[in-house]
């Protein structure tokens, strides 16, 4: 079943979102109820993209500089930062082009603008897909390091990590190109949504299992030292908080965008769904926010990486 033409270019739909000041306001629909629409100005969108761009560039530079960080785990973290970097680049590039076109500073033929939009859409979509892939890869790497600790270095070798990374990038580019080409097909939308749900379930299962195992390990240590309750409760709260942050940030930042895709597939003309469609730009902004938060969760918690990051900053300073 084809999707309605008004939603044909999903990632390009941001082009039709008018610039406005940030506020929460009701937007009346001619045939449906009032809608709450959060308008994201181009300036704010551009600032978020630039912050993410700088942050993830520093992560990639720090990992590339320090040979001690050239391990499979940090390779996955570096690729996640690179994916988030591409999300930022595509967002900044698209917003900048729109601002220049709107101001009349950039004159281009409609066909050129359309081709540029398609390139940006493929870049943005492939970076999103690869980002989800690498989040899942990091979860699997951590799972293996905990449950197969003695065999970890024989299972997760640098050569295998490189092959996995190459396969992820190839799959991301191919699937994104197909998605942009067939974005007017419901099957294409649902495939992307199923992929997101699969990554969400994978991460939830792996991290919950890791939390359970670590909690049992902490209980065993506590029993040996005859102080079970305080250690057990304290560690349990810390582990639960970490798990909540990991999965909560992932769901809150990515969930609305994939809800948008789901609703386009199942109710493109329903008034309530149309209200949600109005916030498409907000959903993209949340993905850019995720690109800002990812380094804080996965990269900057490493003492070795923070030390190298300081050296990189001092070099440029």
UniProtKB/Swiss-Prot annotation:
From start to end residue, where is composition biased (Polar residues)?
Answer: 1-20
Q: Which residues lie on this side of the membrane: Extracellular?
A: 1-37, 94-118, 184-191, 267-279
* Nucleotide-binding recorded as keyword: no
Location of the protein in the cell: Cell membrane
Q: What is its main location?
A: membrane
One Pfam short name = 7tm_1
Q: Where is this region: Disordered?
A: 1-23
Q: What protein am I looking at?
A: Melanocyte-stimulating hormone receptor
Q: Which GO terms describe its molecular function?
A: melanocyte-stimulating hormone receptor activity
Q: Name one GO cellular component term.
A: plasma membrane
What is the phylogenetic placement of the source species in the record? Eukaryota, Metazoa, Chordata, Craniata, Vertebrata
**Purpose:** Receptor for MSH (alpha, beta and gamma) and ACTH. The activity of this receptor is mediated by G proteins which activate adenylate cyclase. Mediates melanogenesis, the production of eumelanin (black/brown) and phaeomelanin (red/yellow), via regulation of cAMP signaling in melanocytes.
Q: Which residues are glycosylated?
A: 29
The annotated subunit structure for this chain is: Interacts with MGRN1, but does not undergo MGRN1-mediated ubiquitination; this interaction competes with GNAS-binding and thus inhibits agonist-induced cAMP production. Interacts with OPN3; the interaction results in a decrease in MC1R-mediated cAMP signaling and ultimately a decrease in melanin production in melanocytes.
Membrane topology term reads: Multi-pass membrane protein
**What Gene3D superfamilies has UniProt attached to this entry?**
Rhodopsin 7-helix transmembrane proteins
**TM regions (residue ranges):** 38-63, 73-93, 119-140, 164-183, 192-211, 241-266, 280-300
Family from the record: Belongs to the G-protein coupled receptor 1 family.
């Amino acid at each position: 079943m084809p999707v309605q033409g008004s939603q044909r270019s999903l990632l390009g739909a941001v082009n039709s979102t008018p610039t406005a000041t940030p506020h929460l306001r009701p937007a009346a629909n001619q045939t449906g109820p009032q809608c709450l629409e959060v308008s994201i100005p181009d300036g704010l969108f551009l600032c978020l993209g630039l912050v993410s761009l700088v942050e993830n560039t520093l992560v990639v530079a720090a990992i590339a500089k320090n040979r001690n960080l050239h391990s499979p785990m940090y390779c996955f973290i570096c690729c996640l930062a690179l994916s988030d970097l591409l999300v930022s680049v595509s967002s900044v590039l698209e917003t900048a082009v729109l601002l220049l076109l709107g101001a009349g500073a950039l004159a281009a033929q409609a066909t050129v603008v359309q081709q540029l939009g398609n390139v940006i859409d493929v870049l943005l979509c492939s970076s999103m897909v690869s980002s989800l892939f690498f989040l899942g890869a990091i979860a699997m790497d951590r799972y293996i390091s905990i449950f197969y600790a003695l065999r970890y270095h024989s299972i997760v070798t640098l050569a295998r990590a490189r092959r996995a990374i190459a396969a992820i990038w190839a799959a991301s580019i191919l699937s994104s190109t197909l998605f942009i080409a067939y974005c007017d097909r419901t099957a294409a939308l649902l495939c992307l949504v199923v992929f997101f749900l699969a990554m969400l379930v994978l991460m939830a299962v792996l991290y919950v299992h890791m939390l359970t195992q670590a909690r049992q390990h902490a209980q065993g240590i506590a029993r040996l030292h005859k102080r079970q309750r305080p250690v057990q409760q304290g560690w349990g709260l810390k582990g639960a908080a970490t798990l909540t942050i990991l999965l909560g940030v992932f769901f809150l930042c990515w969930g609305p965008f994939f809800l948008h895709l789901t609703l386009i597939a199942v109710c493109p003309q329903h008034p309530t769904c149309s209200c949600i469609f109005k916030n498409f730009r907000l959903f993209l902004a949340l993905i850019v926010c995720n690109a800002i938060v990812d380094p804080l969760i996965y990269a900057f918690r490493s003492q070795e990486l923070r030390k190298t990051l300081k050296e990189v900053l001092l070099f440029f300073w």
